[in-house]
């Protein structure tokens, strides 16, 4: 079994190199990103070694199979659930964690597509206001960003995080006694 540091392309490459040096009959991969994972899967295809993907579906890599959620449908459903409580809101918050100018996972990106699709079809007049937080930010950075966001958008009372970091917002809300804002998230 080989483990890599999540969100580290270098760590992923080091581990897949070790994997390819061994005698393997098949591989189960939790992808890092499309292009880095493609480097590995191209080598697996060259050697006729089958592989399956966990968590992130990347059909372009031609896996034997995929195990995980349908992220588009998940985001679509999340929007539907959020709007049960926010159906009269003019604006809602979409908290995104960013690394190098993009969201940190393919699943999060696909959830957002599903989320926005539902909102476009069912709540086209509700504005989605993004709050972008750095992936490896400090508590002080998060606190400053959240304070500024809610001062700039006092009418926002509902929000969502399409990753497992809703606790960052929830923690800030608790510490600042902001009981007028609800946050929904994944993998809590």
Describe these PLM feature segments.
Residues 32, 56-58, 97:
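Short, ordered loop/turn segments at secondary-structure junctions
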Residues 67-93, 142-144, 188:
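Hydrophobic alpha-helical segments within soluble ligand-binding/sensing domains
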Residues 54, 94-97, 160:
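Short hydrophobic segments within beta-strands
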Residues 36-73:
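Flexible loop/hinge segments that line or gate small-molecule binding clefts
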Residues 11-19, 26-45, 127-188:
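Hydrophobic alpha-helical
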Residues 1-14:
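Amphipathic helical "hinge" segments at domain boundaries
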Residues 79-122, 130:
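An alpha-beta-alpha
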Residues 66-74, 103-110:
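Alpha-helix N-cap and loop-to-helix initiation/capping positions
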């Amino acid at each position: 079994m080989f483990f890599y540091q999540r969100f580290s392309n270098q760590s992923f490459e080091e581990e897949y190199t070790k994997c390819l040096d061994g005698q393997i009959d098949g591989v189960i991969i939790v992808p890092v990103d499309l292009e880095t994972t493609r480097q590995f899967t191209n080598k697996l295809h060259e050697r006729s070694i089958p592989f399956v993907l966990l968590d992130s579906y990347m059909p372009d890599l031609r896996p034997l199979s995929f195990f995980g959620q349908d992220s588009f449908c998940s985001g679509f459903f999340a929007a539907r659930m959020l709007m049960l409580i926010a159906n009269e809101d003019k604006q809602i918050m979409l908290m995104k964690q960013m690394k190098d100018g993009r969201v940190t996972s393919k699943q999060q990106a696909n959830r957002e597509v599903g989320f926005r699709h539902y909102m476009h079809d069912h709540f086209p007049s509700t504005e989605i206001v993004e709050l972008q937080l750095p992936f490896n930010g400090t508590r002080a950075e998060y606190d400053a960003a959240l304070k500024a966001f809610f001062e700039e958008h006092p009418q926002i009372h509902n929000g969502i995080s399409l990753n497992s970091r809703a606790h960052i917002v929830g923690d800030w809300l608790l510490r600042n006694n902001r009981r007028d804002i609800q946050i929904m998230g994944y993998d809590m």
